[in-house]
């Protein structure tokens, strides 16, 4: 059995209880493909069906938001790499209650991703092996990836490297194939192209800009996970360099994997194709190109994407709750690590909740699981909002301390304020839209409850912390 090591017993170094086990290629591939999830391959069909070709606008706006948020997060992470990422920065710059709240909300978001991705993987596997129940597949996939996360961070990195590589190959192959078809390189396949689609199916904005707004709210959540690289980089040998590289590359990553590939889909599949939502945008595009075994190909790619997301969900949730425990904002047992510097209690606790919610999905009333999902529905926007507010305050702290700012947010503070206003507007719009209102209410209830717990925890367990000027202060 591995010897358990308390974080406090390790040398006094940044993240000393976690080892820099991620190699450069691990972090690089994670940063490249971390943004590619099952939502791109399947969920994009809903956005296209709702907004038509103007779904490109929705993805462009959402992608721009993510680029700006990642720039702000990159500024803070380069200045102070930390496994807790934005939760730690909120703790230091806004207040302990803020770090507590957003850390636990983020953890909750990812432990709910575990059953979602496990169920999606199980559905694909059950279609291939119908004799085995889906809940068995769901638990088996979760168990397998939990085991890989228990050994070492390098195991997580290696699995994620190959998952990411396969996703990148699949997207690039699709883009190349689609581009060849659009320019007439596949003479036996008729592809109308974007201009013809715009003329034949109601124009670029066939359902009005209200539909684009609805699609925007959907697409914004597709990018959740881009920020994981700032958490993972803290377990690499040169976190500041890795974060800088990942943040600088986010523009072309979103442009290539989302905008270009969605453009290809729209150029091949009419937005009002009745099968677009039913089978997914990428499968429908391959079917229209008469690619043999289109469903099998897409199912394999989606299975890889789902496994990748599940793997990252286990890793990310465990690291966030580990960071909370180190700061005294979670049970102290969750900051224990073994000799491989893996926070096994944090991994097991996060996965246990994931297992529980998977069981709830199969055996509890449907309304229970629906409410659980709704409670995390607006967490992505809250995370982005906290990152923006923390960056506003942390920049002032860094300047006051005299610490050089090696990586800067553009047009500070104007772009930061623009992001804050945009997020507040998006939350307000969600509140008045019937299809999103329940998500805002459920997330708001959970947030208020967590804030109260955070304030109570700070009062009951005061701790000493260091601000960026190096002074000791009561928080």
From Swiss-Prot:
Question: Entry's Pfam families?
Answer: AA_permease
Top-rank taxon: Bacteria
Q: What happens when the gene is disrupted?
A: Cells lacking this gene grow normally on putrescine, cadaverine, and GABA, but growth on beta-alanine is completely abolished.
Q: Membrane topology per the record?
A: Multi-pass membrane protein
What keywords tag this UniProt record? Amino-acid transport, Membrane, Transmembrane, Transmembrane helix, Transport
Q: Which residue spans traverse the membrane?
A: 27-47, 48-68, 105-125, 127-147, 163-183, 211-231, 250-270, 296-316, 345-365, 368-388, 413-433, 438-458
- What does induction of this protein depend on? Activated by BauR.
An annotated Gene Ontology molecular function: gamma-aminobutyric acid transmembrane transporter activity
Annotated Gene Ontology cellular components are:
membrane
**What's one GO BP annotation on this UniProt entry?**
beta-alanine biosynthetic process
Q: Where in the cell is it found?
A: Membrane
Assigned protein family: Belongs to the amino acid-polyamine-organocation (APC) superfamily. Amino acid transporter (AAT) (TC 2.A.3.1) family.
Function statement = Involved in the degradation of beta-alanine.
Q: Could you tell me what this protein is called? A: Probable GABA permease
**Gene label:** bauD
